[in-house]
Amino acid sequence: MKIVILAGGGGSRLFPLSRSCYPKQFLHIAGEKSLLVQTIERFLGLAEAKDIIIVTNKDYIYHVQAELKEAGAEYAHIITEPVGRNTAPAISLAMAYIKMQGAADSETVFISPADHLIKPVEEFRKTVVGAESLAKAGKIVTFGIVPDKPETGYGYIKTTDKISGNAYAVEAFKEKPDDKTAAEYVKAGCYYWNSGMFMFSLQTMEAELKAHAPEIYAVYSSGYEAMLTDFEKMPDISIDYAVAEKSARMALVPLTGIYWNDIGSWDAIAETFSDSTGNMYSGDIIAENCTNTMILGQERLIAGLDLQNLMVVDTPDVLLVAQKGKSQDVKQLVNKLKKEKRKEVDENRTMYRPWGSYTILAEGEGYKVKRITINPGAKLSLQLHYHRSEHWTVISGTGKLTLDDKEVFFREN
C-alpha cells in the first residue's frame, strides 16, 4: 500500500494562526506535535516511510522535510505541485509519481489530508487494513464518520445497502447542509460525514479519471515529468466533484468507534479542547466569569471578564474576535483581506526559511529590527547591499561569517 498525504492547503479558516506562509498542517494545535507529524506517524504503522508520498506546495517543502525528520520518516517522498489545483490534480500527480517508481497497476493507494485528528490510531489502522480488500476488488473506498450531531460544516455521504462486511454502497454526496437539513441527515441514520479519505487501486482510479475527468486523465496519461509541465492545464477541482460523485464504484466504510475531527474551524477546536464550562484557554490568560469562550494568546497577557460565546485568537500582528458558531465565516474575512492586499494574510511576524527563521520585532521608516535564528549547520546566502546597512548583535551560539574576502568566527557579543 502507498500512502499519499495531501499537505498543500492554506487552512484559511484558522486565520490568524494559520497563514499561507505557515498553514494549519504545521501548527501544534492538538498536542506537542504538529498535525502533519501526527498524520505521518499514524501511517507509519501501515506502511514504511519509503511508501509514503507527501504532496505539497513548493513553498512548504522545507517545512515538510523538517516534519518528516521529526516523525522519523526521512525516506518518505515529497512531490510539489507547480500550482495549486485542488485534490483531483494533486492525487493524479501522486499516482503518476507512484507509477514512475515502478508500482504495479494493482497497487493500492490511500489518500489522506494532512491535518486531521484521529484516535485511537490502532483502531483506525485496523479499519484501513480491513477495507483494503474492497480496493483490490475494484472499489473506490471512502471512509465515513458517524455523525453525533447535526453539523453544517461538513459534507455528507448518503449510503444504501450493505455490500460486504461493514461496507455500504454510496448513493450520493451531499453539500454542506443548513441546520434543518443536517438534523434530517442525522435522524435518517444512513448519512455520514465526508472525511476526505479514499483508498483505491491505481487501475481503478485511472479508469474512473478516464471516464469522468478526461481533462485530468489527458494530462495524467502523459506521465509524471510531463505532468509537471502541463499541470496548469488541469481544472481546479476536487476528487469528490471530479470522480467520487459520478462513479458507480464507490463504497463507504464507517469509522465506527473512532474519534475524528478535521480541525477545520475555531469552533471545532473549541469543542474539542473545551472544559466542562465550555471554556478553552491557551497562553497567559486571566479570565473571570466567562462561559463558552475560547481565548488563545501567544505573547502578551489577555484578561477576560464576563465573556460569553466568544472566540478570541491573539497573535503578535492580528487579533481575531468572533462569535462562537461563526468560525466557518472566517474564510470570508480572509478573502476580504486578500482583496485589500493585506500582507497579514500571507505573512507572519515569524517567517521560516530553509536555514531557520526570522521574526520582525519592530519596523518603521528607515529601519527594521529582526531576530534571526539559524539552524545548526545551516547557512545564509552571501548578500550585497548598496542602499542599506546591517548591524548584527549575536545573542547566542557561534558561527563563521564571510565579510568581503575574509572569513571570521563570531560568538555572543
Functional labels for PLM-detected ranges:
Residues L6-A7, V55, F110-P113, T142-V146, ...:
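Short beta-strand segments
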Residues F26, L36, A94, D115, ...:
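Residue-level signal for inorganic ion chemistry
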Residues G31, E41, G45-E48, K69, ...:
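Generic secondary-structure signature for well-ordered alpha-helical cores
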Residues L202-T393, T398-E412:
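Left-handed beta-helix
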